[in-house]
Amino acid sequence: MNTQEILDTYQHSIIQIETPLASGSGFYLDKYQLIITNSHVVTGLKKVVISSKDLKRKEATVVYDDPKYDLAFIRTERLELETTLRLSTNRVHDGDKVVAIGHPYGLNYTATEGIVSKAARLQGELEYIQIDAAINPGNSGGPVLNEAGQVIGVNTFIIQNSNNLGFALPFSYVQEALDAFEKLAQDDIIRCLSCLNLVHESDIKDDYCPECGVKIDVAKKRREGYIPVGTIKTLEGILQEMGKDVALARRGQRMWQIDIGTARIEISYYDNGVIVADASLCRLPQENIEELYRFLLEENSKMDYLKFAIDDNSIMLSYIIVDSSLEEKNGAIALGRLFSKADIYDDILIKNYGAIIIKRDD
């Protein structure tokens, strides 16, 4: 298969994975009903958000975390796919053509082709497949496929400032980890970095390995979960009071995204202390723009907290405040108005003024 055929065939098996601390890729193996990714993608957390072409954003549980191999398994319900990925069983050779699939920079489903420049490159104590396909941030955890569409490795890391020099964990390590995990027949398994034993989360006391006594950092992160603090905690508290699912709304630690009707609201907390909540309503029409502008100006004079603005050709309804002024009461009032007004104004602008619905790549 060529690159486009591989992408068309298997893109439904490629999963986007997000935590407040990182984002990356993974791939679904139907045989195990597991999503395979990197340990560093899940950032030690037990709960992550997953999505795909066939899967709406939802929380899922990391059931296996292996810092040694930089592997993690995520449990999900069976995905009904016409064609499913499977691990290769064939030896990889220098010069083999490969395709790396993932979500670079959080974008949807891209594939880059290249070759195996070295089938076994020793890094630390593990052998990796060195490839020259472009691997970008966000590709981590995604599959590297051969020409038959079989998984030969997991995109794991790149060498900074190199010319497309990427490294994939070979399928043999993945298969070894899957076999060991399946043999235990239980979830919530962590590999100790010191003794390399697989231990159950419930057997770990005070975050120390029950086999060798060395502290397991991943155990503490999984137990505590993600804990927002300061202004981020205040913002998320407001959103929760409004009935929003904060875990699904997060886009990193300092940004949240919520869709209300056809409007999309993005809340950003900047390093300078400014909080901006933008509702992207619709696009400017090609006709009757003056009439629309007049309406926006009239509405601006009537509103507290909120203001209309134009960003390129998008009509925005915005709320801006500095963190030192944000309190739960005033924040809840302002964001409540933004959410309700956004749902009303996008309909008015589209129906009465010919504004154009924004097409979104979800």
Predicted regions and their residues:
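C-terminal cap/linker of serine protease catalytic domains
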Residues: 1-7, 104, 151-219
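N-terminal activation segment of mature serine protease catalytic domains
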Residues: 1-25, 47, 179-184
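Flexible, gly/ser-rich surface segments that form the specificity/activation loops bordering the active-site cleft
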Residues: 2, 83-127, 136, 156-166, ...
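Conserved active-site neighborhood of the chymotrypsin/trypsin-like protease fold
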Residues: 12-23, 30-101, 106-109, 125-126
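Catalytic nucleophile loop of clan PA
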Residues: 27, 134-155
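Long, charge-rich boundary regions
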Residues: 220-288
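Short, internal acidic amphipathic alpha-helical interface segments
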Residues: 277-318
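Short, highly charged C-terminal tails/helix-capping segments
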Residues: 349-362
